[in-house]
Amino acid sequence: MKNILIISSSPRKKGNSQILCEQFKKGAEEKGHQVKIVRIMEQNIGFCRACDGCMRNGGICVLKDDMAEILKMFQKADVLVLATPVYFYGISAQMKTFIDRTYPIWQHLGKKEVYYIISAGLGEDIIERSLGDLNGFVEHLEEYKIAGKIYAANVMDAGLVKNQRVFQKAYDMGYSV
């Protein structure tokens, strides 16, 4: 059994990337894995202040918010799923905030099996920048394997992924972990 942490950065509870996260979770749980979805929008997470207080304080951020608990979950996870909608040709602000706030532990991110879930209102070509942002973060893990990627393109309206093959692919990817 693996410990799976899904970081969902969709601001919409019923947004396409969130729906795909739920499908991934369903597949992984049916395989017997322990899965936790953290919806960034539902957390109290402030922006990094770039004060380097965490570097002077043993990796503990000066901000007292929900990120401390999320970082503990992050470090315990065997599998990391990063899910984001594409906004203005990049990852969501919520995902960027999450990534920035991992700075206190960036030298101790650990080994992870990584999956991406990216949804976009336009074609697949605009997903490339978001993919670059996620890859830039993942490359800081001590050891990583990008084990799977799901792209849902041309899904502007919430819920459109339910009628596409990518919906089943998300379940299958979770089940394959």
Predicted regions and their residues:
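Short, glycine-/small-residue-rich phosphate/pyrophosphate-handling segment
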Residues: A93-Q94, W106-K149
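Short glycine-rich anion-binding loops that position phosphate/pyrophosphate groups of nucleotides
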Residues: V86-F88, G121-L122
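Short, histidine-centered active-site or binding-site loop motifs used for metal coordination
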Residues: S8-S10, I118-G121, A153-N154
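N-terminal beta1-alpha1-beta2 submodule of the flavodoxin-like/Rossmannoid cofactor-binding fold
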Residues: M1-A83, Y89-P104, Y151, G159-V177
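Short active-site-adjacent structural elements
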Residues: D125-I126, M156-G159
